[in-house]
Amino acid sequence: MNAYDLTRRVYDVDLWWQPVRHRFRRWSSYDPAGNTLLDYDKFVRVAGNVGVLAETPESGAIVRIWTASDVNRQVRMFQGGAGKPFLDAPLPALFDGSFNNRTMFQTGVDFSVTDEKQWPFVPPFTGTHRGAYVCRVPIPFRDGLRVEADLIANPRVGLFYHIDCLLADEPQDVHGFDGRFAYRDFTVRHAESIHANPLAFYADELLGARCVPFQGRGDRVTLLNVKGAGLVRRLTYRLTDVSLENLHDLRLTISYGNRPPSFHAAVSLLHCAAFELHGYRSRALGYVDGAFHFQFPIPFRDDVTIALESITGRTFGVEGEALLLDREPPAGALLLHSHSAFDAGAEPSRYVFADFPAASGRYVGLAFSCKPYQQEDNEVITADGEVVARGTGREDYFNMAWGFKEYGAPDHGCPVQSGEWPWQDLQRGHGYYSAYRHHFNESIPFRRSFEACFEKDHDPAKVGHGWASTAFLYLTQPQTANAIPADWRRWAKPE
């Protein structure tokens, strides 16, 4: 676990199927009393005029910092129990390009050889996203971490934050953060190219991948059926004779061997089209010029069958291609799974969007739709019986802040949003949205069990809100997918 490897893989889909060698932990400003409107200025502890945002004796790496606060307060990071911080900077400098590696780093590295004072806190690893400030610069630490911030006695400038960390199973493999330049040029150019075209991959053909065309017509069409072992890199397909309403009934399925599908998802929900179908491009999914793109890697060890089927028996046409590597995946490669869910909103309690009581693997993302508009619910993610992440509002989970607005990035976005301010109007029965989030460096591993939910904020006025989603996971062994019920299509209308 080192800064170079983590930085070059900020958007690496091949991280998802690799064996788990770390744990995940988030520190956030959520309100322990459950009031989602007070999810700010909550700290691990307070000492004088300093609040501790995150603290652990373990070794690992910070892989994501999110905040909705741009106030100029000082942030300091310590590792290994040191009394002197290795980073001492104003909070906005981690996001807005004002970082100065000559004065804000205390790592022993000589930065005078370059004019680029902002490295490594540079775009596209840092930036603002629809009101939020997000930093993806990986910051490894050895033998402990403490992150603290100065307190500001002003209720109008509360600190909302997430600090996502990987905790290493093998601490000796962690190389502490020093901010050196050895990997700057490659990693920045690579990340910039992904932001320019998230759907583009360049090296698969060099690795021997071959294109497998497919086409068919009927109420079920097999896109790919391969014996033995291999790795499907991506699928691209176009549909004919399928309206948006009928897209709700069309399912993409993936089966390993002769087992029931481990992946079973409505095509419309996958592509954030529960209400409207808009063009978008993420690293794993996209819809561009009438073509659907599915770029979750699909390793398989004992045959794979990928199909499209209409659960209502409607005939459709499809043509496209799969990119296939005819080689056995490395030992321990994880298998792609889905968990689809739907809740019409009858009970204001919890919306569970992933539930695997007996499994091992990684949680890597979510496609989510909501109607009417709602945002002030917090995600609660539990791995192996322990809560490892709590959120501060649903839009915060999707790397936004202060509401949902249409936006797209390689790892998160909101292709569809309808409704206008004020919040009260949206919260109480108007508007809808569809959003996606992919976890790369910050994928959440588990070894025995996993559950993820949004805790509804128990406002009786919100009974009747509905949710639909597909979660994406990679597991060590095939399990049967949880499929969304057929009646969700009656809810999926932009009314």
Language model regions located:
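Beta-strand-centric surfaces of beta-sandwich/beta-rich domains
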Residues: 1-495
